[in-house]
Amino acid sequence: MKELLYTALDVACIIDMEGLSVQEAVLLAQRMHAEDKSFLAMEYRQNYRKWLRDILYWSDYMQDKIALDAEFPSVQAVSDGTMDVSALMRDDFNLDLFFKRLRVQILYFGEQDYARMKLRTLMAKYGYQRRSKDFVRFLKIRFVFYHIQTALRGNEICDVETMDSLDDMITFRVV
């Protein structure tokens, strides 16, 4: 479950995706540290300064990712080939980022206390075409961890495993 906790890199990615200014990013970091401390990686729970510093570091990286990634081969040459550059140049930082971003959007960004999406769209984000048991288990673990409740139109609580149609609109709420 450690991988489900927010890291500074996760928050920097969310900041980049949302196009937040530095001032908005600092406010988000403050609120998350104050209100969602139990969801932060252990190293940040008691150290706001490190939390903010690391978020700003990764945010800076996200702003100029292409140029910095281009420098990695020369860094590896200087390190005598002991550094694994491919691990640092990933574009998919974390598949769980979708759920982390969903929680942040609902709690901190939106005027609404919910988000909506079709199950088919959610599956497409992960490259799934069928509602497999592994995918449903993956979803349920994240829904429970992030306290996300799913409902159909009319606030009818639903289970993604037993929904009739993949094209039903799901409402996500943090409870």
Regions found by a protein language model. Give the residues of each.
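Hydrophobic membrane-targeting and insertion signals
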Residues: 1-6, 14-15
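Charged, low-complexity interaction regions
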Residues: 14-23, 34-43
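Structured alpha/beta or helical-core interaction and ligand-binding surfaces enriched in interleaved
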Residues: 18, 94-101, 131-132
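Charge-enriched amphipathic alpha-helical scaffolds
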Residues: 35, 39-58, 123-160
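Long, low-complexity, charged/polar intrinsically disordered regions in eukaryotic proteins
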Residues: 41-97
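Short helix->loop/beta-hairpin flanking segments within DNA-binding domains
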Residues: 97-113
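Short glycine-rich, basic-tinged beta-strand/loop micro-motifs
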Residues: 109-130
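C-terminal edge-of-domain segments
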Residues: 156-175
